[in-house]
Amino acid sequence: MSTPALLVLADGSVFHGTSIGYEGSTSGEVVFNTSMTGYQEILTDPSYCKQIVTLTYPHIGNTGTNAEDEESRSVYAAGLIIRDLPLLHSNFRASESLHDYLVRNKTVAIADIDTRRLTTLLREKGAQGGAILTGADATIEKAQELIAAFGSMVGKDLAKEVSCTETYEWTEGEWALGKGFVTPDEQPYHVVAYDFGVKTNILRMLASRGCRLTVVPAQTSAQDVLALNPDGVFLSNGPGDPEPCTYAIEAVQKLMESGKPIFGICLGHQLISLAIGAKTLKMRFSHHGANHPVQDLDSGKVVITSQNHGFAVDADTLPANARITHKSLFDNTLQGIELTDKPVFCFQGHPEASPGPQDVGYLFDKFIGNMKAAKRA
């Protein structure tokens, strides 16, 4: 017999459905993601910490789960909302059903609700707090208490919550059919990567391009990073509000003074922007999906990108030495900048995809080019 589940939003909206995961309760910011596939990568993306993810594609779980598609060491999404969980899963790589995976990772999830109605509501009113409760004793009143306790994503420094606690080395490259994860024979570039919630495919794409990575915790000082003598510094994606991450902003400012090539993605993009004096703002309509068109202003090309952020950089606050390189064609929000006087650039979306297209994978090549030029100088 199925277990009932309840989804309640901060605006008072109520959805009744079925529990498909761990029995219990959870709260967070409710967002929607338009990706058709990649649910396991989404669940394990640390950028979804404290967020309950609604997947707009109706059938989720068809291909099961496997150990190779993990983007971090655990599930970070606060909860999952879907329309329908198939009775069977089928894929040659599958080792576990989505239901069993959710239970094992203690992830609360709800199905059999009208996700079209929910998505429309979130699109019109914006992302908001919500709670999922399972079991016959779940009540709207209890959900409202959880929502009130959660509050808002504004002001939440989550990067240091999801970051590694110890420095570690990474050399593993991208996955290949029949070979698994391949480590390149030569890795001539040493990159220090800040872990603000880094996805493993970012590390793999850098490693496949010849980078030996030293991954450091979010609160590592610039002095400690420079002592490692890197060829370049990478600033990762991550969850939460970038403004409270003052430790990271100060470190980025000092690293930029060193002249080292720096590349930032997602939260890393926002931290670079804050470090040069720009401002960030909470988006009413956050970007979550694998089909977002972005224009590369240098080439004029339109690239399809994977996106996952609820904060954005205010383009009107950029200093004179910051050149805009990319913009969203959905809402014209800032997607990328490059400094004109330092080898520093960043991108709001996710070039590594996982899930999604890798149209902007060339940004990793640009970072390699900057390090190569710096080594020749």
Swiss-Prot record:
Reaction(s) this enzyme catalyzes, per UniProt: hydrogencarbonate + L-glutamine + 2 ATP + H2O = carbamoyl phosphate + L-glutamate + 2 ADP + phosphate + 2 H(+)
Descriptive protein name: Carbamoyl phosphate synthase small chain
All residue ranges annotated as the Glutamine amidotransferase type-1 domain in the record: 190-377
NCBIfam families: CPSaseIIsmall, PRK12838.1
PANTHER family from the UniProt entry: CARBAMOYL-PHOSPHATE SYNTHASE SMALL CHAIN (PTHR43418:SF7), MULTIFUNCTIONAL TRYPTOPHAN BIOSYNTHESIS PROTEIN-RELATED (PTHR43418)
Highest taxon, organism lineage: Bacteria
Residue ranges of coiled coil: none
Subunit structure: Composed of two chains; the small (or glutamine) chain promotes the hydrolysis of glutamine to ammonia, which is used by the large (or ammonia) chain to synthesize carbamoyl phosphate. Tetramer of heterodimers (alpha,beta)4.
